[in-house]
UniProtKB/Swiss-Prot annotation:
PROSITE patterns: PG_MUTASE (PS00175). Substrate binds at residues 10-17, 23-24, 62, 89-92, 100, 116-117, 160-161. Belongs to the phosphoglycerate mutase family. BPG-dependent PGAM subfamily. This is 2,3-bisphosphoglycerate-dependent phosphoglycerate mutase. Catalyzes the interconversion of 2-phosphoglycerate and 3-phosphoglycerate. The record marks H159 as: Transition state stabilizer.
Amino acid sequence: MSERLLVLVRHGQSEWNLKNLFTGWKDPDLTEQGVSEAKEAGRKLKAHGLTFDVAFTSELTRAQHTLKLILDELGQPGLPTSRNLALNERDYGDLSGLNKDDARAKWGEEQVHVWRRSYDVPPPGGESLKDTLARALPYYVQEILPGVLRGQRTLVAAHGNSLRALIMVLEKLTPEGILKRELATGVPIIYRLKADSTVESKLDLAG
């Protein structure tokens, strides 16, 4: 029986991560460090003997570039890939493009903290984490998971908050639990699933 392999990786450091800006659906590329992180992710996966049958990513450059660099390291540059905005980062609305310190100065530290760290309170014109999960989860269940369960070795390169949606389901986390989960840039997480789609094993390639 073929293995049910699912690997999740957050994009490498972006130019706006470096500048401490709210990014969301804005589209900066990777920094030099981000490029290095993505290549290292590919090398780590190769060292574990992994190759893939299919990949998924968002409509944003930083995730697509990360995926390309990983696949180049794996010697799989032509891997079939689906891109979909369901995997885009959380939309930060009016916060997008603002320095996080400037946002605190404008709205107050407590309000910005609520927007960033609550489960269901969106910033003006943007999405809450709950909203982000509401678009990412159906895509995972309908488009990604069926292939994994058929034995397609699957790689997903996306964003901190859209990946939280997948992790919330995989690890059966509560809203409070997923809020506490931080995802490092460019670090693959390897899941192997049981036939009922629950997690058989998990390996985080941090470090």
